[in-house]
Amino acid sequence: MDKTIKVILLMNSERLISEIEEVSADIGEPDCKLIKPMEIWEGPNLAPWMMDHTKQDTFMINSDKIITLADPTPTLLEKYEDCTK
């Protein structure tokens, strides 16, 4: 199965790049699985999302917290893949 890697803009203005999977869930339950999300900083520089708070690399979030999804540029995708090997 091919990975779906997207740039994600969250409602709190955080910009992430992550493998993302839609999962079935009950209403109100998290329905998006982020796998190895990286926060995008200026440059663009990447850092593991919530790295100061957890070693976890898989997160469940509600899709209503996502403003938009976009395809990453080839350069950003390559950088993400290098960081998540």
Could you tell me what each predicted segment is?
Residues 1-85:
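Conserved RNA-binding domains used in RNP assembly and mRNA/RNA metabolism
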